[in-house]
């Protein structure tokens, strides 16, 4: 399985709680309704992995969320990328500027290999 894995940091003026609320309840629905059916059909999953505060919460994790978008193969990932980086995908990119520090985002294309559940 091919995945786009993005390490996301919130903007400095956005609290962690506000970031999570916006990402889950505003951006994710925008993601779902903005993507045309032919592009949505190539996505196998969309997952937000939010950082958990540990200890007293006085220190921030280096990233606030790790987002995964999965595809069955590299061509399907390219279909998504063409849409996202094109004019129609601008609606998502513009929305990301509202709550993400996009200058700190790290994006990696990965090939997932599940090792097993007994490890």
Q: Where are the regions a protein language model picked out?
A:
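Macromolecular interaction modules
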Residues: 1-119
């Amino acid at each position: 399985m091919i995945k786009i894995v993005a390490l996301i940091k919130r903007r400095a003026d956005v609290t962690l709680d506000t970031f999570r609320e916006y990402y889950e309840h505003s951006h994710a629905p925008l993601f779902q309704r903005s993507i045309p059916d032919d592009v949505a059909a190539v996505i196998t999953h969309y997952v937000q992995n939010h950082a958990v505060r540990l200890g007293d919460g006085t220190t921030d994790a280096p990233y606030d969320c790790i987002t995964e978008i999965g595809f069955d193969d590299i061509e399907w990932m390219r279909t998504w990328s063409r849409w996202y980086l094109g004019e129609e995908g601008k609606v998502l990119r513009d929305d990301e500027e509202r709550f993400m520090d996009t200058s700190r985002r790290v994006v990696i294309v990965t090939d997932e290999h599940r090792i097993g559940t007994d490890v």
